[in-house]
Design a protein with these regions (language model features):
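Short, polar/charged alpha-helical segment
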Residues: 35-61, 394, 412
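Hinge/lid segment of periplasmic solute-binding proteins
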Residues: 84, 93-154, 182, 287-293, ...
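Long, aromatic- and glycine/proline-rich binding clefts that accommodate carbohydrate-like moieties
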Residues: 336-400, 426-428
Length: 428
């Protein structure tokens, strides 16, 4: 797309940065809790590099702990519990959360009210997708976090394999061939016959099913199983037995290898952050040989929200970070163009698409119309604070079933046992 430099806007941004630096009376250390490199990259590339005066004299510390097995939450919980007694330079200022466990932190006094405590206005977040605000709104209606992302999903597939097996790599035509699960299964059989795997492994389709559940994981204190979860189990067992998948686990080396230029996996259920942040780019990768379509059913997956921590002495900086990264249209466009992220503004994406946005990783396809269509219908009404644990434990328990190590009844017993160990207040 054509990149336009608007001199007036740039001058205003510089002036705002100078004014901010002059009036900031906060602390000298900014502590940010994260689980991976994603937010540090967005912070450094789209905030720190463009607002150097805002951080003059301030040391930024990223405290990073992996998300798996509840490690990040455990680390964050410990720090939040000690927040009141921590030294000023040791207090948490910002921390990241994701959808699977957002409610755990939103409905507490550990998170600052974005409007009342931090100072953003309703007009600032007006263009953000409603579901991204609903996820981080507490039971009293207070907004407790913001995100630069929206996360509508689809199916990202290899163009060259589509041409070879299906006769076309055109996203609209490929979509017509996989527009429901029966058609998707039929294409999986064709891919197998041609020497390819439809999916990488056991977990690839999980989010496409799980995000379409009608009932939450937990009602009261009872674990519930939605039919969509059973459909995922049935399909994945079939794909594993028939060789339609490569029997890999998500995030494994085998799964990543399937994404490389010489990989044999046809496609992955993905959202913007997945193919931008998790799929290989550069030498040896299949960059440019991918395309994006809606897939058999719409879904969303994940997303990162930033929350201000109660007790922070850097509220001015927190406000500036939140506004710049999640409310400022020019910054959001920049994130989309340079990082490939699906941004949290339908208006900004519409402008980018109109201006000829192309994604090089996707063979210069414009995926924004798909994002705009799927993003408008996302609902998170079935979310609970137990989602991360339940999602992780069901995938772990069923892996043994998919591999033939246990029968289905045993896999279910193992699932319930592991969830109740994690959340002792629950029952099957």
């Amino acid at each position: 797309m054509t990149k336009r430099i608007v001199i007036g806007a740039c001058m205003m941004a510089l002036a705002a940065s100078s004014m901010f630096a002059a009036k900031n009376k906060g602390g000298k250390v900014l502590n940010i809790y994260v689980w991976n490199d994603e937010f540090p990259a967005r912070f450094n590339d789209f905030y720190k590099s463009k607002n150097p005066k805002a951080l003059q004299g301030v040391t930024v510390n990223f405290i990073q702990t992996p998300n798996q097995n509840n490690a990040y939450q455990d680390k964050l919980d410990e720090a939040l519990l000690n927040q009141a007694n921590a030294k000023a330079d040791d207090k948490i200022d910002l921390f990241c959360i994701e959808a699977d466990y957002a409610l755990k932190y939103v409905d507490t006094t550990y998170t600052l009210d974005v409007m009342k405590d931090i100072g953003l206005k309703a007009k600032d977040v007006a263009n953000q997708y409603q579901y991204t605000k609903d996820i981080v709104t507490d039971s009293k209606g207070k907004l407790k976090g913001v995100s630069w992302q929206s996360t509508p999903g689809g199916f990202v597939y290899r163009r060259s394999y589509a041409k070879e097996v299906l006769g076309t790599d055109d996203p609209a035509k490929v979509q017509a061939m996989i527009s429901d699960w029966d058609k998707f299964d039929a294409v999986a059989a064709k891919m197998k016959e041609a020497g390819y795997f439809m999916l990488s492994g056991y977990d690839d389709a999980f989010r496409a099913f799980q995000d379409n559940v009608k009932s939450p994981w937990v009602k009261g204190n009872k674990i519930t199983i939605d039919p969509q979860i059973n459909r995922w189990i049935e399909q994945t067992k079939t794909y594993s037995d028939k060789g339609y998948n490569n029997k890999a686990s998500l995030w494994s080396a085998e799964s990543t290898q399937g994404m490389m230029k010489d990989g044999k996996v046809f496609g992955y259920f993905a959202v913007g952050w997945f193919y931008d942040f998790c799929m290989p780019h550069g030498e040896g990768s299949a960059e440019g040989d991918w395309a994006f379509c809606e897939g058999p059913q719409g879904f969303s997956w994940g997303g990162t929200w930033i929350c201000g921590a109660a007790g922070s002495d850097n509220v001015d900086i927190i406000k500036d970070i939140m506004y710049t990264l999640t409310c400022d249209t020019n910054t959001l466009k920049d994130i989309c163009v340079k990082a490939g992220d699906c941004i949290n503004s339908a208006a900004a994406m519409q402008e980018l698409s109109k201006d000829g946005y192309k994604n090089a990783f996707l063979g210069n396809q414009d995926p924004l119309p798909i994002y705009l269509k799927n993003g408008a219908s996302i609902s998170k009404k079935t979310m609970t604070k137990y989602d991360q644990g339940c999602n992780e434990k069901i995938q772990a328990a069923m892996k043994d079933y998919f591999e033939g190590k246990v029968d289905l009844d045993t896999a279910w017993d193992n699932f319930y046992t592991s969830v109740i160990e994690l959340y002792p207040n629950l029952k099957r």
